[in-house]
Amino acid sequence: MSRAGTWMKMLGVGIVICVGGPAFVQYIRPTDEELFKRYNPDLQKRSLEEGDRRAREFDEYVTRLKQWSKSDKSIWYAAQEQQEQKRVEAEVQRNQARDDAKVQREEMRKELLGEK
C-alpha cells in the first residue's frame, strides 16, 4: 500500500476515534431522569426534599468563590480568612451568650434572696 493510503487509513481511524468515542459515551450515558428512576422510593423522596437545599448551598458556594476570586489574594487565603472570621464571630456569640446567662443567673439569685 502506498504512503498516501496509509495516511488516509490513519486519518480515518483518528476521526472515528475522536468523533466516535465521545459520541458512544454520550449514547450510553444515562440521563438524570433515568438515574432518578433507578433510585429506591426512599432515596427518591429524600432527593426531592434535599434538592432545593443542595441547590442553595451550591449557589452560595459559587457566590463565595466569586467573591474570593475578586481579591488580589489566592482563593485559599481568602477562604482561610473568611473561615477565621466566622470562627471569631462564633466565639464572640458564645461569649455573649455566656455573659447573658451569667447576668440572668445573677438576677434570679437577687430575686430569690430579695424575696426571702
UniProtKB/Swiss-Prot annotation:
Recorded GO CC terms: mitochondrial inner membrane
Coiled coil regions in record: 78-112
Keywords: Chaperone, Coiled coil, Membrane, Mitochondrion, Mitochondrion inner membrane, Transmembrane, Transmembrane helix
Region (Disordered): 88-116
A Pfam entry, by short name: CBP4
Annotated compartments: Mitochondrion inner membrane
Cysteine pairs bridged by disulfides in the record: none
Membrane association type: Single-pass membrane protein
Domain of life: Eukaryota
Chief place of localization: mitochondrion
Membrane-spanning intervals of the chain: 7-29
Keyword Transmembrane helix applies: yes
Gene Ontology process terms (BP): mitochondrial respiratory chain complex III assembly
InterPro entries: Cbp4 (IPR012420)
Family to which the UniProt record says this protein belongs: Belongs to the CBP4 family.
Described function: Essential for the assembly of ubiquinol-cytochrome c reductase. It has a direct effect on the correct occurrence of the Rieske protein, core 4, core 5 and apocytochrome b.
Protein's recorded name: Assembly factor cbp4
Organism: Aspergillus niger (strain ATCC MYA-4892 / CBS 513.88 / FGSC A1513)
